[in-house]
Design a protein with these regions (language model features):
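Catalytic-site neighborhoods of secreted/periplasmic enzymes
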Residues: 1-45, 132, 202-205, 238
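Active-site His/acidic residue clusters
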Residues: 42-91, 126-136
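A long, amphipathic alpha-helix that forms part
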Residues: 40-47, 77-118, 175
Length: 294
């Protein structure tokens, strides 16, 4: 049994196989976006139903938190009364609100006696930079992948291995005893050897408003490649023409080709493309070999 709650941009969740859902959400509206803000009850009811039917379950909790509207409960907002910027105070309270709901969900798993037999993955879609979801730089694309599975995963922190969101599906399938199909990209994150063998990671950044559903290259802004200490950001010559959102949001900030030494310059302040043309060419060749639109 599978449940989707929260944000979903691809029509109705049942079209991709969810057995249960809160309905379509559209972009910034819909009943499903009430999850977390109003109640966690739809998730708790679903878990109860799965237990009653003695079936394994999958829950996708995608709350519209800490997204706008920034309307945190007063009990949380009061904790940040000393923050001078009212907008920042509200945002901090929104983050704590999200944190609360995640804690409530974890507590519910314990209450139902399934916490030790449930793999929990916490993901985010952008990094910590202002308007970070649009940046091809590290403070935009570095996001948390936190896993919790008592008895199966030992607590640790790893900031060095190359991991991508495409690894989530093969990880969940393997954990559930399902062999991922050979055509599925990504690696099983529970297999440390497989993760360590990954030498290259590719990233792509698209326009906020999709230009074409069938031709993804028309919406492309940047292509990036990371291998070893090197990272190349290749800006598309004729990107989609949309108005930047300010704060650098999908706004070109550098040269067409930017090469960074992430070991010596983790904040990507020095473009070394002209000093190392051979590295640029190597990474461009890798990108072109990876980017094949079917």
């Amino acid at each position: 049994m599978t449940l989707h709650t929260g944000k979903y941009w691809m029509g109705h969740p049942n079209q991709v196989g969810f057995t249960d859902d809160m309905g379509p959400t559209g972009r910034h509206g819909g009943k499903a976006l009430s999850i977390g803000r109003k109640s966690m009850k739809p998730i708790y009811d679903f878990i109860d139903k799965a237990q009653q039917q003695e079936k394994p379950f999958f829950v996708w909790y995608a709350p519209f938190l800490p997204h706008t509207p920034h309307n945190p409960p007063d009990r949380l907002l009061r904790k940040y009364a000393e923050v001078k910027n009212p907008g920042n105070a509200k945002y901090l309270a929104m983050i704590e609100w999200l944190d609360e709901t995640c804690g409530e969900l974890m507590s519910q798993l314990k209450k139902k006696g399934v916490a030790d037999n449930t793999l929990v993955l916490y993901l985010a879609d952008n990094g910590w930079n202002e308007y970070g979801k649009a940046h091809p730089y590290e403070n935009g694309v570095r996001t948390p992948v936190i896993a919790h599975w008592p008895g199966k995963i030992k607590p640790r922190k790893d900031e060095h291995q190359l991991v991508s969101n495409i690894d989530v599906v093969p990880t969940i399938l393997t954990a559930a005893g399902v062999k991922p199909p050979p055509s599925l990209p990504g690696v099983n994150l529970l297999n440390q050897q497989a993760v360590a063998q990954r030498e290259t990671l590719f990233l792509s950044n698209f326009a906020h408003n999709m230009v074409s559903a069938t031709e993804p290259e028309k919406s492309l802004w940047t292509q990036s490649c990371i291998t070893g200490k090197w990272k190349l950001v290749a800006w598309i010559k004729n990107p989609p023409k949309i108005k930047p959102w300010g704060g650098g949001h999908r706004k070109k900030t550098g040269a067409d080709l930017e090469l960074f030494d992430l070991h010596a310059d983790p904040h990507e302040t020095k473009n070394l493309a002209q000093a190392h043309p051979e590295v640029v060419q190597d990474l461009l060749t890798r990108i072109n070999g990876w980017w094949k639109v079917d």
